[in-house]
């Protein structure tokens, strides 16, 4: 029994008495506590008190203390054991024979007799110890006083009959009957026996319920700590097992597919040979064995590919020429894509019929476009583009594929500068030129406009398969990236090094940070959600979702920090279900009534009360989280919705569809988009969903494309204001960590790379 527990409980009792107004009771309680006979159940202090009574020859208080201990504690130990025995016999009387029961009772009776005998012997020895101490100190009068006071009681004990002569023996130390009691050995043995007995009694006495509550609370905390430690050990072992299973699976795939290209089978477009590389700062999205090449990749996460991007002026071209590797066909080239126009007010949907693009994925490509002006641009794969801004006729000769391109400048299209990654035409100072037609408005460039420029870019090549998702932690200190091989990597942005690899054993389709507790949620295509604590760098556990809907298509964390939503669909993508989960218990809270809708993308509003969803049937549905039912919905796209995102003002909503449309909506005037953005289209095959990412003040947003770049938009301008290039495959995921001081963009592609791009901001004061 811990004295600190008693003191803590005493303070609680005093606090309760004062709270109830029992001031007099509290006063007496304090007085009795000062005269505590038990000394807080501290054996040393009780023995010290016994020695004080003996040394002061206070036999009355000595006997009183012993009787108090006997009645209060010693007898209760006996009573408790008796009850335990009786209960045990009652519960087992149908199974024990009479012989066994009698044997158990005999054993108990013997133990009980031993306890009573021990108590009686210690009581007698304590009094003998008092008498011997008095004789050793020549206090014969105290000895006679003792026998006079307790003679009637002692005469009943045969062991004491010879002790009545002790005060009259001249030299009792040499008397054979009493010699042993005057030895130091007997005195020390008695003191040790008494100490051990009291310690055993105090450890086994039944505690009051009020004290048991506090002890149980402490015991529960101790057990919880043990459970946490065991869970941590279990997760470490599971992580090791997952890693070994992943390596085994990789080795099996490696042995069976040495001559196959995973990139060709997954992306559906022609890949150049490994030897055909540009001698520039980017790597081609090439074929080769994914698993073999992963062993050759460096462990270091990011490598600097450019220190500074200087914007340069460029000529106009159509959207098909925006890629820096035009000779290779792009995913989705077979369908029409909206061209990016500088003036969407006049030419949002106008496509010049004089411009044609013919692509052959098996042979070299020759593209001819008639132009009305004259300019010459010679492009070589080993050098940067040379642009003559005084002429208006461009002729591009590529030594790798022999592509010749003539571009018109009267179709309203603007070429994206691949060297500086700056959209539209710019002057010698790096600012965008004003529109030649002099139009002002949402798409015009006005004085004082914020301009983004790419300052630097780093590339990560540690993933061995196509990227599926990448996302910043809210404070920008960490990056999570996932790939189709089932691995998730956590990166420390400040140190630019790979920190942790999480093995999920199947393709990771969704990724989400819970920013308050720094948890990472990874949804896979085999009915699992892995939850990882980035602070402790350990797994919390796995959530098993419905086997009927194995693909966890999207995860969205509620801004209130209490829950998250998951959208799971079946393998045929014909049915799905949406659940909300309690983040603390990891149990389902609500099943949203989606009326059979298959949901690809989800987004909470800033208060966490509404959930917007983008569906396979092209509709946007908005759910009320409290009721779990849709409160609004409209047909937004003619094909699947791949991304839907709430703005922080809770009035605007952005959506991206497989139909190549990128819209801004007002949820109070549904049915007609507020703005349509010039967008080249997103990846069609294989199926991917994505996220639209905003800067800190929601004035700009970023989105990936089926080309080899991501596009940055001002929310009030239809045309993109910046292109984030460098990838050699479609950009399927991106995220933007923005603050008033810095802007960092991360993009992930089917080329297996992650690119970290730092932006600089300036204002156009022309």
From Swiss-Prot:
Gene3D superfamilies: YVTN repeat-like/Quinoprotein amine dehydrogenase. One of its GO terms (molecular function) is phosphatidylinositol 3-kinase regulator activity. GO terms for biological process: early endosome to late endosome transport; negative regulation of phosphatidylinositol 3-kinase/protein kinase B signal transduction. Disulfide bonds: none annotated. Belongs to the WD repeat WDR91 family. SMART domains: WD40. Its main location: membrane. Keywords: Endosome, Membrane, Repeat, WD repeat. One of its GO terms (cellular component) is endosome membrane. It comes from Dictyostelium discoideum. This is WD repeat-containing protein 91 homolog. InterPro entries: Apc4-like_WD40_dom, ARMC9_CTLH-like_dom, WD40/YVTN_repeat-like_dom_sf, WD40_repeat_CS, WD40_repeat_dom_sf, WD40_rpt, WDR91. Functions as a negative regulator of the PI3 kinase/PI3K activity associated with endosomal membranes. By modifying the phosphatidylinositol 3-phosphate/PtdInsP3 content of endosomal membranes may regulate endosome fusion, recycling, sorting and early to late endosome transport. WD repeats lie at residues 462-501, 503-542, 547-591, 594-633, 636-675, 684-723, 726-766.
């Amino acid at each position: 029994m811990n004295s600190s527990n008693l003191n803590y409980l005493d303070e609680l009792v005093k606090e309760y008495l004062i709270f109830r107004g029992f001031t007099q009771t509290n006063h007496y309680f304090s007085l009795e506590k000062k005269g505590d006979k038990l000394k807080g159940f501290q054996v040393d202090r009780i023995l010290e008190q016994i020695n004080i009574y003996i040394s002061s020859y206070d036999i009355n208080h000595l006997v009183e203390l012993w009787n108090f201990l006997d009645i209060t504690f010693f007898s209760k130990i006996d009573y408790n054991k008796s009850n335990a025995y009786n209960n045990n016999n009652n519960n087992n009387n149908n199974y024990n024979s009479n012989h066994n029961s009698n044997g158990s009772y005999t054993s108990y009776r013997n133990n009980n007799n031993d306890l009573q005998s021990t108590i009686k012997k210690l009581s007698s020895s304590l009094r003998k110890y008092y008498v011997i101490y008095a004789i050793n100190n020549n206090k014969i009068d105290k000895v006679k006083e003792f026998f006079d006071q307790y003679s009637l009681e002692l005469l009943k004990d045969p062991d004491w009959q010879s002790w009545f002569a002790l005060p009259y023996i001249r030299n009792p130390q040499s008397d054979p009957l009493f010699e042993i009691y005057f030895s130091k050995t007997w005195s020390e043995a008695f003191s040790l026996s008494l100490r051990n007995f009291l310690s055993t009694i105090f450890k086994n006495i039944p505690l009051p319920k009020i004290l048991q509550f506090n002890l149980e609370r402490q015991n529960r905390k101790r057990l919880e700590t043990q459970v946490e430690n065991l869970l941590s050990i279990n997760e470490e072992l599971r992580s090791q097992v997952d890693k070994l299973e992943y390596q085994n699976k990789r080795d099996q795939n490696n042995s069976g597919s040495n001559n196959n290209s995973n990139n060709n089978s997954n992306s559906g477009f022609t890949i150049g040979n490994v030897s055909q590389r540009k001698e520039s700062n980017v790597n081609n999205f090439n074929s080769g064995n994914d698993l073999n090449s992963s062993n050759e990749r460096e462990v270091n996460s990011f490598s600097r590919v450019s220190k500074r991007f200087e914007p340069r002026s460029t000529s106009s071209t159509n959207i098909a020429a925006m890629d820096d590797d035009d000779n290779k066909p792009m995913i989705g080239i077979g369908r029409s894509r909206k061209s990016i126009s500088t003036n969407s007010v006049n030419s949002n949907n106008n496509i010049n019929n004089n411009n044609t693009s013919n692509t052959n994925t098996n042979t070299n490509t020759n593209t001819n476009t008639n132009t009305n002006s004259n300019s010459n641009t010679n492009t070589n794969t080993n050098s940067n583009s040379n642009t003559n801004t005084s002429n208006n006729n461009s002729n591009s000769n590529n030594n790798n594929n022999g592509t010749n391109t003539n571009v018109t400048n009267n179709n309203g299209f603007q070429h994206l500068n691949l060297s500086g990654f700056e959209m539209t035409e710019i002057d010698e100072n790096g600012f965008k030129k004003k529109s030649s037609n002099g139009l002002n408005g949402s798409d015009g460039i006005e004085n004082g406009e914020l301009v983004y420029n790419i300052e630097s870019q780093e590339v990560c090549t540690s993933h061995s398969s196509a990227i599926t998702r990448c996302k910043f932690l809210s404070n920008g200190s960490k990056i999570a990236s996932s790939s189709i091989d089932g691995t998730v990597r956590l990166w420390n942005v400040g140190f630019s090094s790979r920190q942790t690899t999480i093995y999920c054993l199947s393709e990771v389709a969704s990724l989400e940070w819970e920013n308050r507790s720094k948890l990472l949620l990874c949804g896979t295509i085999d009915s699992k959600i892995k939850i990882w604590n980035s602070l402790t760098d350990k797994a919390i556990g796995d959530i098993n979702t419905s086997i009927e809907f194995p693909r966890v298509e999207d995860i969205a964390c509620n801004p209130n920090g209490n829950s998250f939503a998951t959208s799971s669909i079946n393998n045929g993508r014909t049915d799905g279900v949406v659940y909300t989960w309690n983040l603390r218990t990891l149990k389902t809270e609500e099943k949203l009534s989606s009326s059979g809708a298959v949901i690809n993308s989800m987004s909470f509003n800033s208060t966490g009360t509404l959930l917007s969803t983008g569906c396979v049937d092209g509709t946007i549905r908005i759910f009320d989280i409290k009721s779990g039912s849709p409160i609004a919905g409209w047909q937004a796209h003619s094909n699947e919705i791949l991304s839907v995102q709430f703005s922080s003002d809770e009035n605007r909503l952005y959506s991206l569809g497989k139909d190549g449309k990128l819209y801004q909506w007002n949820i109070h005037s549904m049915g007609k988009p507020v703005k349509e953005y010039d967008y080249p289209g997103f990846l069609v095959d294989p199926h991917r969903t994505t996220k639209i990412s905003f800067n800190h003040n929601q004035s700009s947003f970023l989105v990936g494309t089926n080309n080899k770049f991501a596009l940055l938009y001002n929310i009030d301008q239809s045309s993109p204001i910046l292109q984030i290039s460098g990838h050699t495959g479609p950009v399927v995921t991106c995220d933007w960590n923005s603050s008033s001081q810095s802007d960092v963009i991360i993009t992930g592609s089917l080329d297996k790379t992650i690119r970290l791009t730092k932006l600089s901001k300036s204002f156009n004061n022309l």
